Amino acid sequence: MEKKILEYLKRLEEVEVKISDPEIFNNPKEYSSLSREHARLTELKNVYDKVLRHEKILNDDKHALAQEKDPEMIAMLEEGIQSGKSEIEKLYKILENLLVPPDPDDDLNVIMELRAGTGGDEAALFVGDCVRMYHLYASAKGWKYEELSASESDIGGYKEYVMGISGTGVKRLLQYEAGTHRVQRVPETETQGRVHTSAITVAVLPEPAEDDEEVFVDEKDLKIDTFRASGAGGQHVNVTDSAVRITHLPTGVVVTCQDERSQHKNKAKAMRILKARIRDAEMQRRHKEASAMRSAQVGSGDRSERIRTYNFSQNRVTDHRIGLTLYNLDKVMEGDLDTITSALVSHAYHQLFQNGNEENS
């Protein structure tokens, strides 16, 4: 780790020289990139400086302890040593995260697709609960939230719900929500008090940036159908053909949008979802080909993988990929997801850091 830190500190000096050159302002894109790198490397330097200070204090305390005779001073020094070790351990975990090269996609916006799975009506209701949970989380993080498509259930909740979330760090924090979420609770209609188990699936699709050249959709590869929008129960809610169904012929990806009264707006939303799905399919293909990338993931990201269980009677939420169990499900459902998302990101960074060390050894 020491060697890699010193390499980054040297890189920080190089970046500082480049960013202080007035010519850099003639290239806004490079300036923006260097500014982000400078911020990350400066944070790394600050944390490393803290480590060095704490290690010096720790060594001084150990030296003093070896010579101390007074019981009270010994107890105080031992407490200080223990506290110092704990603080240094925390700082090294932060350093681990900072030493992993940032993913250029970390700040991409995402499209999240939630679908009711096993459990019928109860699964649809839980989709509604999770939609609210993610909405509250997005608000707490200062992100922009947008409903893109919704298929309501007859008794409430949603058979399917598609949302767009945009802001800083969206993809980095939400990417590990992909998979099967299982819920265990007593339905309101259950008279015997029996706990039912149902499940929903969540897909997290990074939304391609406008200048992403890898996701090009040719109009001639699209089949676009228009029809009248319908609500729950199948009744038509619009007298014009405002609903849009787009089929991408080369991949077979189909997207339908009917929430807006305007056909133009529905088509625009459908195209956003379509591009995200095409990009996701390509990324999934690449991940399957790269075993190193697979081993670095927190779980496989497969929609069929059970990643989390929400047990309402025990107020418990368990993330099975990292063995994290919390007894504050009530707060989690109110959008307090930071403990879970941060733990997943840290775990993923730790794996990436370990893999990087193995490759360099």
UniProtKB/Swiss-Prot annotation:
Methylated by PrmC. Methylation increases the termination efficiency of RF1. SMART domains: PCRF. The keyword Cytoplasm applies. It is found in: Cytoplasm. GO terms for cellular component: cytoplasm. Keywords: Cytoplasm, Methylation, Protein biosynthesis. Gene3D superfamilies: 3.30.160.20, 3.30.70.1660, 6.10.140.1950. InterPro entries: PCRF, Pep_chain_release_fac_I, Pep_chain_release_fac_I_sf, Prokaryotic/Mito_RF, RF-1. Peptide chain release factor 1 directs the termination of translation in response to the peptide chain termination codons UAG and UAA. This is Peptide chain release factor 1.
